[in-house]
Amino acid sequence: MAALWLSAAALGGCGVQQVMLDTENDYLFLAMDTLSPPGREIVLQAQVRGGGFLRGQCGLAVRFFRDGVLFKVAETGDDGVAAVTFTPGAPGDYEFVAQVAPAGLGQSPPEPAALLVACRQPDAPLVLVDLDKTVVASGFEAVLLGTPKPMDHSRRVLDRLAQTRTIVYLTHRPELLGPKSKRWLADNGFARWPLLAGTAGGFLKGSQAYKAAWIAKLKKTFTNLEIGIGDKISDARAYLDNGMRAVVILDMPPAGARDRQAKLKRLAEELKSLKDDEKAQVVIGWDQAEKAIFEGAACPPSAMRQRLLDLAKGE
């Protein structure tokens, strides 16, 4: 179903795209966040897409600014991507703004897009956090069409985690939703942490495979991927397989929901795939996640599985 919504967004007219993807003047302008260790040359990328199929726009000049000063200029290729190199000298957050020059555009250029380089030492502790039904209280469809709310306590707990760790938003959302995702996070008071998204092809492969691929990529540079937080049990398996702690914030069917009993049983069955391990914690809500992470509260998969089965019996 999510794939159908994504296709509708990409193939729809400018009105549909504006609602679903936050396009501007028939253009979608993407700027990709990244992580890097100090002293390594990296590539900063921004992409211009446009038209009914959101094709890459070739031959446009994209200016990259840092601290309000022009850093470099690059021209978009056939895929609409403009790329420049940058070498962060020391750990810290390096903020850039990418801007499309108006020359060659049929309409006014889209608004500038922010790009973050989070430079960290290779042994810096990282926390990977999903967005939908984890930070955002709704699923993919509501993100495209509505104004979803944050999960209760999510911002507070993430701020607490960020005092000693680097937060990375690792979302299964495709990069087409990057501008909308960043705007939502800012509008709801979340700190500016790197947002890693994937291609449409990666989206279609499924969340677990997508997360596993990103983890493998990050592990080539960063040795302390500490915690993964999300709503999907399958994602937790990807985190655990890579030696991380996994905190599953279950997407519980609300009381009175249609087929609630079947959904509770399905969640309980899925939890069988997680062994009771001090690194696997299953909770309901960010307040419980906070206790599991900071206070060592025991939240084993088997206990949650039994709770789900007990709830199902009462339906």
Model-identified regions with their sequence ranges:
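Short hydrophobic alpha-helical runs that function as membrane-insertion/retention elements
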Residues: V136, I167-V168, A246-L250
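Bacterial N-terminal signal peptides that target proteins for export
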Residues: M1-L4
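Intrinsically disordered, serine/threonine/proline
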Residues: L6, G12-A114, G314-E315
